[in-house]
Regions:
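Active-site-adjacent beta-strand/loop module that shapes the phosphate/pyrophosphate-binding cleft
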Residues: 17, 75-98
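NUDIX/MutT-family hydrolases
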Residues: 88-92, 98-131
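Glycine-rich phosphate-binding active-site loops on the catalytic face of alpha/beta enzymes
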Residues: 214-223, 250-264, 289-313
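Active-site mouth loops of central-metabolism enzymes
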Residues: 133-148, 229-234
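Conserved N-terminal beta-strand and adjoining loop/helix that marks the start
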Residues: 2-23, 74
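Conserved Nudix-box catalytic region and its N-terminal flanking loop in Nudix hydrolases
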Residues: 21-61, 72-73
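Conserved, mostly hydrophobic/aromatic
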Residues: 137, 164, 203, 243, ...
Length: 313
């Protein structure tokens, strides 16, 4: 970026290895924020798509050929010298070994403990997003029964589940409280995090990690609730925008496909989902009529991951 840049489109790569590490590069001397660490990438040229800019920049900067890249987040960041629109991609497969072709230092990093500093300001929110797993499970104790659900939850946790929403609309509050307490205890024993649907007081009572706001709560909310994690259930571009305005950690966007729980509802379909997710600055999970095998499609359409209800258990 030069001093003359005022509104710049940038393609940014989060190169992720199977072991969970990701690549950061140090900005060279003589450029704005020299010495700061960032995700690699560069300016989108006139007539170029952000994806093609990504492929070109990674070849020029790192000497690699992109094989698989997924659109992820779009964030606008204002520096003193420029306003930049950052189009983030998760790059999971490439040919060649990344090396600094322009003399820049590179470092593979792992969250939560970064060994490089300082981090470019626009990249800091990305670190929180990277810590979110790709599967978000929603409880189904109403159909399974509490004891069977908790058994299935323990099994899922043993198999790597790390994010859970407790959502049982028809449970009396004392029953819901007991379920939530037990689910939080199980989840925390495996390093997983739990959000409670809609009930902020209950989330505080049971020591949950966060709350999942309904659309009505989102509309009425003046500020982000005080939790480690806060998300919202969205059905429109306007609701997604509001969730991002409140700096929520992520959003659910639904229904993508026809669902058993909402028969006859108008579903978005993948193309509308992709259009709505493309302009979102926070991670979006796809929900509605999905199965685990839809994860790849969800990534291609710009989702961070998928949320499952019946299919999770």
């Amino acid at each position: 970026l030069t001093e003359k840049d005022s509104n710049v489109e940038v393609a940014v790569a989060v190169l992720q290895r199977p072991d969970g590490t990701f690549l950061m590069a140090q900005r060279p001397q003589g450029r704005a924020y020299e010495g700061y660490w960032e995700f690699p990438g560069g300016k989108v040229e006139a007539g170029e798509s952000s994806y093609h800019a990504l492929v070109r920049e990674l070849h020029e900067e790192l000497g690699i050929e992109v094989e698989k890249a997924y659109p992820w987040l779009t964030r606008v960041f204002t520096y003193p010298h420029a306003t930049v629109r950052l189009n983030f991609f998760r790059v999971t497969s490439w040919e060649g070994e990344p090396h600094g072709r322009e003399g820049q230092l590179l470092s593979w990093q792992r969250l939560p403990d970064l060994s490089v500093a300082p981090i470019l300001p626009a990249n800091i929110p990305i670190m929180r997003a990277l810590q979110l797993p790709h599967l978000y499970a929603i409880s189904n104790a109403t159909e399974l029964g509490t004891e069977v659900f908790l058994q299935r939850l323990q099994l899922a946790l043993n198999n790597g589940l790390r994010l859970l929403q407790i959502r049982e609309k028809d449970f009396p509050r004392p029953v819901l409280r007991e379920l939530s307490l037990r689910a939080v205890e199980l989840a925390h024993g495996s390093g997983a995090r739990v959000l409670i649907n809609a009930d902020i007081e209950l989330a505080q009572e049971v020591g949950a990690d966060g709350v999942q706001l309904t659309g009505a709560q989102l509309a009425a909310c003046d500020a982000r609730p005080d939790f480690e994690l806060c998300a919202a259930s969205c059905h429109s571009a306007e609701e997604l925008h509001r969730a991002a305005e409140l700096s929520l950690d992520f959003a659910l966007l639904s229904p993508v496909l026809p669902t058993k729980s909402h028969p006859g509802a108008v579903n978005l379909g993948w193309d509308r989902f992709a259009t709505m997710a493309a302009s979102c600055s926070i991670p979006v999970y796809a929900l509605g009529g999905l199965q685990m095998q839809d994860m790849e499609m969800a990534w291609q359409k710009g989702a961070h991951g998928i949320a499952l209800l019946r299919q999770a258990w």
